[in-house]
Regions:
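Carbohydrate-associated surface elements
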Residues: 151, 172
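A short helix/loop element that forms part of the nucleotide-sugar donor recognition site in Leloir-type
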Residues: 178-192
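A short, well-ordered alpha-helix in the C-terminal region of glycosyltransferases
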Residues: 323, 330, 337-347
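Conserved donor-binding/catalytic core segment of Leloir-type glycosyltransferases
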Residues: 192-208, 214-217
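Nucleotide-activated donor-binding/catalytic signature segment of Leloir-type glycosyltransferases, i.e.
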Residues: 241-257
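Aromatic "clamp/platform" in nucleotide-sugar-dependent glycosyltransferases that forms part
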Residues: 258, 277
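Short hydrophobic beta-strand element within catalytic cores of glycosyltransferases
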Residues: 294-297, 307
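Conserved acidic donor-binding segment of nucleotide-sugar-dependent glycosyltransferases
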Residues: 309-310, 314-321, 330-336
Length: 347
């Protein structure tokens, strides 16, 4: 098949899943065309049947805001016509599904549109009053719709009164890539005195509650020797660095920024924290679990569908720093329980 894929090309979960899906389809012999404003971050290496098409943006001074939606639709038309695409698979309804629908109307052929809902396009952006009618229309007009969790499917149906069937297809990872590979040298460089290593990865947006991660770690640190690794970057990083200085824990916290390969860092870590305000699935938690790391998470969105409280980690209410810290200390000080949870997380 000839498949077009549009996603946000960033380090977020939706872009990662879309890119890994495209690579896997290409390995199975399909021709895959990525259509976006930048090269997806995970699209590394060369595959002969993967082609990237960059969306060209107009800089005409009359327009106060970039016209990405029509520019994307125009590029979709171009690629679909000349590459004879069978399917356009768009990740995020806003604005990608809108552009795909416009492209299909322009082409007027049997091009199929599959829309995958990932979260904030439904739970935040889509609930803006000015978007409500458009969101319902574009979901109903897609030839197929998937959501990354039951939580997101149900919320979409309720919020927009959707009658169309939405299939739940959970996010995924390659278990052969995401598996624990012990690296004593790397671990010693991070924790020279054999401290426990706590890790968090995110885009440092408000919804991820990274300051909670730091406060939980501060409580852990009062009881046991530990180090915190923070992977990623975003608007709250500076505030988080300031919080570390205020708490006097900078020596034990490492801000590593964006990393192209996080498996080595996951492989030396003992605990993963994800205290998010909202999380439609939680791909970063799945990556950690595949590397045999117990997870401490908030009880939001799709996270309770991903991990089992008391088996693969623990779940607490949003903002309950004391309870998350208590659970963390329990796992980090009980080797037998930690081993059982680690094995369950992988399996």
């Amino acid at each position: 098949m000839k498949i077009g894929i549009t996603c946000y090309p960033t380090y977020g979960g939706s872009g990662v899943v879309a890119t890994e899906l495209g690579k896997a389809l290409a390995e199975r012999g399909h021709q895959v065309h990525f259509i976006s404003y930048a090269l997806p971050s995970r699209l590394d290496g060369f595959l002969g049947n993967i082609i990237y098409h960059e969306v060209e943006m107009s800089t005409y001074p009359l327009f106060e805001f970039p016209l990405y939606t029509p520019a994307l639709a125009s590029k979709m038309v171009e690629v679909a016509k000349f590459e004879k695409l069978d399917i356009l698979h768009v990740h995020y309804a806003v604005p990608h599904a809108i552009s795909a629908y416009l492209a299909k109307q322009i082409i007027g052929n049997k091009l199929k549109i599959i829309t995958t809902l990932h979260g904030t396009d439904i739970t935040l952006v889509g609930l803006e009053p000015s978007f409500l009618h458009m969101m319902k229309f574009i979901i109903e007009k897609s030839d197929g719709v998937t959501a990354v969790s039951r939580f997101l499917r149900d919320k979409t149906i309720t919020n927009f009164q959707i009658e169309k069937e939405i299939e739940v297809i959970y996010n995924f990872i390659n278990p052969e890539k995401y598996q624990r590979r012990e690296n004593l040298e790397l671990r010693k460089s991070i924790a020279p005195d054999n401290e426990k290593i706590v890790i968090h990865t995110s885009n440092f947006r408000t919804v991820k509650r990274v300051p909670d991660v730091i406060r939980i770690f501060n409580e852990i640190r009062k009881k046991i020797k530990a180090k915190l690794i923070l992977i990623g970057d975003g608007p709250e990083r500076s505030a988080c660095e300031m919080l570390c200085r205020e708490l006097g824990i900078c020596a034990d916290v490492k801000f590593l920024g964006k990393q192209s390969d996080i498996v080595p860092l996951l492989s030396v870590s003992d605990l993963f924290l994800i205290p998010s305000q909202s999380e439609s699935f939680g791909l970063s938690a799945l990556e950690a679990m595949a590397c045999e790391i117990p997870v401490i998470s908030s009880s939001v969105g799709g996270l309770p569908e991903l991990q089992v409280h008391g088996e693969t980690g623990y779940i607490a209410e949003i903002g309950d720093i004391d309870r998350m810290a208590k659970y963390s200390i329990e796992l980090l000080t009980n080797l037998t329980k930690h081993t059982i949870f680690s094995e369950a997380a992988r399996n």
